[in-house]
């Protein structure tokens, strides 16, 4: 309770390392919130989610937002990721370290023969890494950050995230 602001809901079975969960946030069972992660006001975190060290999940109060960030069940959010402005990370998606997602961040699926663009939603089971694309400005061409969907979650991805499951199953605190 030291790291939880009054008015936040944290379900039984949640592992909360030194981190912060703000007012109105909802964190469902079996979730791990690792060291120095922040869950913003009214953010919704599903079951068995892993928020790695230093993750920032935005809230709706500062700056004022109409929709909360939603991280659906069984998602994995890698170290130092930032997810803000009402972005939705759907079920079993994996965000690699340092992915930054805002409401206006281009999310580009590069798994097909032609890129497919999204904004505001990471589709289920997507594996996402930081990327960039070239954009022309009056002063020239510059690389702009984006998020790249490079595949779908596979058994090998599950093995990389399975330590969390083992710790939960055997009720081991880290």
What is the meaning of each model-derived region?
Residues 7-10, 38-45, 71:
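Cysteine-centered iron-sulfur cluster-binding motifs in ferredoxin-type domains/subunits
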Residues 22-26, 42, 46-47:
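Glycine-rich phosphate/diphosphate-binding loop of Rossmann-like nucleotide-binding domains
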Residues 30:
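Glycine-rich and polybasic anion-binding loops at the starts of cofactor/ligand-binding domains
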Residues 34-43, 51-57:
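Glycine- and Gly-Pro-enriched alpha-helical subdomains that act as flexible
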Residues 47, 51-174:
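Glycine-rich hexapeptide-repeat left-handed beta-helix
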């Amino acid at each position: 309770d030291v790291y939880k602001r009054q008015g936040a809901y944290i379900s039984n079975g949640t592992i909360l390392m030194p981190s912060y969960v703000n007012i109105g946030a909802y964190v469902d069972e079996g979730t791990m919130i690792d060291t120095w992660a922040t869950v913003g006001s009214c953010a919704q975190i599903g079951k068995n989610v892993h928020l790695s060290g230093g993750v920032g999940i935005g809230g709706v109060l500062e700056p004022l937002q109409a929709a909360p960030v939603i991280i659906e069940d069984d998602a994995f959010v890698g170290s130092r990721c930032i997810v803000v402005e009402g972005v939705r990370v759907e079920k079993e998606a994996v965000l690699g370290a340092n992915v930054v997602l805002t409401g206006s961040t281009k999310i580009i699926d590069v798994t097909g023969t032609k890129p497919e663009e999204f904004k505001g939603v990471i589709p289920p089971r997507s594996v996402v890494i930081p990327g960039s694309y070239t954009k022309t400005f009056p002063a020239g061409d510059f690389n702009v950050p984006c998020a790249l969907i490079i595949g779908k979650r596979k058994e090998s991805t599950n093995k990389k995230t399975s330590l969390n499951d083992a710790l939960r199953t055997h009720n081991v605190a880290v």
